[in-house]
Structure formats: structure tokens, C-alpha cells
Regions:
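Short glycine-/aliphatic-rich beta-strand segments at the starts of folded cytosolic domains
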Residues: 1-7
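C-terminal structural segments of small proteins and small subunits
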Residues: 47-73
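Short glycine-enriched loop/turn motifs at secondary-structure junctions
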Residues: 1, 31, 48-52
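Amphipathic alpha-helical interaction surfaces in cytosolic regulatory modules
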Residues: 11-27, 35-50, 67
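A structural detector for beta-sheet-dominated domains
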Residues: 7-9, 31, 59
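Conserved beta-strand core positions
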Residues: 4, 26-28, 54
């Protein structure tokens, strides 16, 4: 599992983020405090406080991890 900080502090950034993570077959979770939500769920992402950076957990991405991180920049 790889964990990175992401900042998705606007509606457009949330839409773009969810579109990108849905292109991959891996599990993506957003974590803030005690809440963990599926990062592929736009409703789930909007339920979080997106004004602050969030932790993104990427599970089992293997060799594609660098490609994923590059696409999220």
C-alpha cells in the first residue's frame, strides 16, 4: 500500500480526481481523521472536508504506482 497526500479543494478537482482513479482497477481510499471512504465514489469524496489535504491510500498498484501518481499531479 502506498499513501500520499492529495489536495482536492474544489468541485472541478474532485470531478477530475474521481475520473482518474476510476480508470484503474485498484482500491483507492481517502482518509481523514477516523473516516475512510472509497475514493472512487464522488458522493463519498464530497462527504469529506475537502478544504484540507487528505491521505490517499492506493492498494496493490504494483508497477503502475508511478503512472497513477503522475496522473494525479
Amino acid at each position: 500500500m502506498k499513501t500520499v497526500k492529495v489536495s482536492i479543494d474544489s468541485i472541478e478537482k474532485v470531478k477530475e480526481f474521481v475520473t482518474i482513479v476510476n480508470e484503474y482497477p485498484y482500491d483507492f481510499d481517502l482518509v481523514t481523521g477516523r473516516y475512510v471512504i472509497n475514493a472512487k465514489s464522488i458522493m463519498g469524496v464530497f462527504s469529506l472536508d475537502i478544504s484540507k489535504p487528505l491521505d490517499l491510500n492506493i492498494r496493490d498498484a504494483g508497477a503502475q504506482i508511478n503512472e497513477i501518481l503522475e496522473s494525479l499531479k
